[in-house]
Amino acid sequence: MDAIILAGGFAKRMWPLTKNKPKQLLNLAGKPMLDYVFDSLDNLDFERIIVSVNSFFAPQFQEHLSSNSKDKKIELFIEESTNENEKLGALGALNLLFKKKKMAGPVFIAGGDNLSDFDLIKMIDLYEKSNSDVIGLFDVENIELAKLYGIANLEGNRIIDFVEKPSSPPSTLAATAYWLLSESGINNFFTYIEGGGDRDAMGNFLTWNVKRNPVLSVSFKGSWYDIGGLESYSEAQNWLEKRP
């Protein structure tokens, strides 16, 4: 199984910090954000870890990996975008990567700006038992907070509905940027894209997919930070500094 880390955005909401530096290379408690993502994947035994980046920031990623990574499994995939107006979106980047790399699945996908203390092997274990797509969920434990996220409604551990930023959340289980797509899941992804599906937010594909195919979930507890702005960046920094 391969893993993909999505790091192709321009993070304009975090300017000026990210105007000339990719968000995933910002320092967090002594090391770049991206290295924490690598750490979370360390024990999962992937054949390759592919970091998808835009062409504007690609040289900085190349320099970081050549200077700091001894892991030959890690490689860059450079998207054809140099600014915000040209960005492919998360799903557009995956579509290009899947086709260029001829990836048939299964594949594990992690957001390059998601930090957590989750035991992600649980997602792989569930995939191996079910051969189904698996999404990592996190219980935000607050209905008002749930209105800010993409929220899953479950039947057992199967996601039967998914809605982005609902005014009346069906649960408090938020989708993280940890996904595992099976072989059939990638085929379904291509069907979605070829049918004109939105190529930006990953949640749009999840909304479409759960109504047509079995998508299972692992509900995690612990700590999870989706670093989309300066406030969540500061919260993640504080969490990491306090960790033993």
Each predicted region: which residue ranges?
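Residue-level signal for inorganic ion chemistry
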Residues: 34, 97, 113, 152, ...
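Active-site metal-binding loops of divalent metal-dependent hydrolases
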Residues: 10, 112-114
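Catalytic-core segments of class I nucleotidyltransferases/pyrophosphorylases
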Residues: 108, 115, 124-128, 158-244
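N-terminal nucleotide-binding beta1-loop-alpha1 segment
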Residues: 1-20, 26, 44, 214
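Conserved N-terminal catalytic core of the sugar/cofactor nucleotidyltransferase
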Residues: 2-5, 13, 31-110, 122
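Anionic-ligand binding region
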Residues: 141-169
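Conserved donor-nucleotide/metal-binding helix-loop-beta segment in metal-dependent transferases, i.e.
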Residues: 118-146
